[in-house]
Amino acid sequence: MITIKKGLDLPIAGTPSQVISDGKAIKKVALLGEEYVGMRPTMHVRVGDEVKKAQILFEDKKNPGVKFTSPVSGKVVEINRGAKRVLQSVVIEVAGDDQVTFDKFEANQLASLNRDAIKTQLVESGLWTAFRTRPFSKVPAIDSTSEAIFVTAMDTNPLAAEPTVVINEQSEAFVAGLDVLSALTTGKVYVCKKGTSLPRSQQPNVEEHVFDGPHPAGLAGTHMHFLYPVSADHVAWSINYQDVIAVGQLFLTGELYTQRVVSLAGPVVNKPRLVRTVMGASLEQLVDSEIMPGEVRIISGSVLSGTKATGPHAYLGRYHLQVSVLREGRDKELFGWAMPGKNKFSVTRSFLGHLFKGQVYNMTTTTNGSDRSMVPIGNYEKVMPLDMEPTLLLRDLCAGDSDSAVRLGALELDEEDLALCTFVCPGKYEYGQLLRECLDKIEKEG
């Protein structure tokens, strides 16, 4: 067991009950183009086209051969683009149940499948995009291999679903997915979990590792740091547990599995719980009649590192397993910093709230102050469990010094790994965005 002592479990109200129920009927789904780092699409459909489930929608010009497929059968009703013609979303109106089918196999055949056959089926179905590389957090090239695939079978994000609830419901598919991954990699498959028991693959290169401690103990970046540190020449892939289930279903049934179980939770959700929906679901439809009156912000993903779901982005993200809802923090408080703060949370224990153990808070979107200078008062060190100097690294990200950032470990990180640093920052810096700018610069310069 690897125990993490540094970190932070955010005491936010609205924890979901760990029981799965069916979500609202979804009439629109979308693929969000900006989720895929560096992707430039070659479109295969236009508005008005009828598409089958698992039919190709677009390919990546910069990563030849990588295909992005439809999660449902229906009609393309919107192709939204932003500045410089960046693809924002391809929206599909759900209709019918036509689908593209693939080869299917018996469970005892999966571990002995040819690696090229596995790649072909994953690419053609669109499930290849479930993998993300470190460094850079991109979809891997289809001619690449990895000596380490990390399966995140735990989730320490605030308000997250408990993975064992989902995995135990799909245990056969989960094991089948692990068997496929074991044949895909030239090295090991690391299944990272809490201390709970999970269905196990019998393949010798599939290892289970237990992590314990506060968030970010459940992030792929944390697991890689301790088990297989990455660098420019040392690449690892990660995949979440629900995509492992989808891989298993694809090879067992020959059909693309796009069902998602997400946590619908937060301080303004009427009944926080786990809901069954579809990948790319319209979040406006999913949360309909589920939230309290007033101005709220719907977030695809974690409250720490998710994205605001509005307009052309108002859909469930490809890599997101939760939908968080917070009240917009529009109200200003005169001299709020000077008040006792019984119902306020502070990492630095500035308020009385820290005296009440186990208290949860109705947090909002307010940042409690305006932007200011970066102030190194030890907050970053409290929440960074990785063996690196966070204050120095974050300073270099602010200054745009990519050479120094690489020396300090920037290549190991993804935006989600710095989300807690953003949360505890007195200067209100968005370190995830600064990290992405730095990684883009490093990759461009080679």
UniProtKB/Swiss-Prot annotation:
Composed of six subunits; NqrA, NqrB, NqrC, NqrD, NqrE and NqrF. Belongs to the NqrA family. NQR complex catalyzes the reduction of ubiquinone-1 to ubiquinol by two successive reactions, coupled with the transport of Na(+) ions from the cytoplasm to the periplasm. NqrA to NqrE are probably involved in the second step, the conversion of ubisemiquinone to ubiquinol. GO terms for biological process: sodium ion transport. InterPro entries: NqrA, NQRA_2nd, NqrA_C_domain, NQRA_N. It holds the Pfam family NQRA_2nd. Keywords: Ion transport, NAD, Sodium, Sodium transport, Translocase, Transport, Ubiquinone. It comes from Vibrio cholerae serotype O1 (strain ATCC 39541 / Classical Ogawa 395 / O395). It is an enzyme of class 7 (translocase). It catalyses: a ubiquinone + n Na(+)(in) + NADH + H(+) = a ubiquinol + n Na(+)(out) + NAD(+). The keyword NADP does not apply. Its EC number is 7.2.1.1. This is Na(+)-translocating NADH-quinone reductase subunit A. GO terms for molecular function: oxidoreductase activity, acting on NAD(P)H, quinone or similar compound as acceptor.
